[in-house]
A protein has these predicted regions:
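Acidic, low-complexity terminal tails and accessory targeting/binding regions
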Residues: 1-2, 44, 75, 82-94, ...
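Active-site-proximal alpha-helix that buttresses catalytic centers in soluble enzyme cores
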Residues: 2-75
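Beta-strand elements within well-structured catalytic alpha/beta cores of enzymes
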Residues: 2-6, 54, 131-144
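Short, solvent-exposed loop/turn segments at secondary-structure junctions
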Residues: 9-12, 58-61, 81-82, 142-145, ...
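A short acidic, glycine-rich active-site loop
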Residues: 23-33, 105, 161-170
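Phosphate-handling substructures
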Residues: 24-29, 68-122
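Generic structural signal for well-ordered alpha-helical scaffold segments
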Residues: 39-43, 117-128
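Active-site signature of alpha/beta-hydrolase-fold catalytic machinery across serine-
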Residues: 67, 147-151
Length: 201
């Protein structure tokens, strides 16, 4: 199965660079598709892969599907949902220490690895069986996709603190990560960046 992972379009919180309470309900403007997204990123997603779209259940991911592809996802799965970091409240996570982060967010690498395996194996097999396809567009979140990158490239023990701070791999809104997953083997194909990562101030 070849996955085309896309991070959702930016919400007001992404644009402001802060975490906010109730972010799980944040939405985007479905009429605000960047004119150059297809040229810079979308061109790397073949028509066959666009036939089936899966997504996190959050509004911003559902709306990103509608914005980019003109329709809502064919399937919605909690496996693509965001890791739970709500206890951070409105803190700027790059301004807090790793110790403080870990006191607020319990997210060991084993938990993230379990989720990655669920996406790449269980969800992939289900989509292949139900839709008779070998490729799928998957719309998800920054932390999930950044962790998948590390997992696929042989670094499953990376910390949640490093993931949320984009250490070792930055992945911004509307970026694309392509991963080719075969039985027992995950291969990173490439990542295509729509925009530069936000500068932290």
């Amino acid at each position: 199965m070849k996955f085309y992972f896309i991070r959702h379009a930016p919400t007001y919180a992404n644009k402001s660079g802060i975490m906010v309470n109730g972010y799980e309900n944040a939405d985007i403007d479905i009429h605000d598709k960047p004119e150059d997204w297809e040229e810079r990123v979308g061109q790397y997603i073949p028509e066959e892969a666009r036939r089936v779209i899966i997504s996190s259940p959050t509004r911003r991911c559902l709306s990103t599907s509608k914005m980019l592809f003109g329709r809502y996802p064919d399937e919605v799965t909690e496996a693509l949902g965001e890791f739970d970091c709500k206890n951070l409240g409105n803190r700027k996570f790059w301004e807090i220490s790793e110790e403080e982060f870990n006191s607020l967010v319990y997210l060991p690498s084993s938990t993230m690895a379990k989720r990655a395996n669920e996406i790449l194996t269980d969800v992939g097999n289900l989509i292949k069986k139900e839709h008779n396809t070998d490729s799928v567009v998957a719309i998800s979140h920054g932390m999930i996709i950044r962790y998948l990158y590390h997992y696929i490239t042989g670094h499953p023990d990376v910390s949640a603190y490093d993931i949320i701070n984009s250490k070792g791999y930055a992945f911004s809104n509307l970026d694309l990560l392509v991963a080719d997953v075969n039985p027992g083997v995950c291969n990173l194909v490439f990542s295509y960046h729509y925009s530069k990562p936000m500068e932290r101030k």
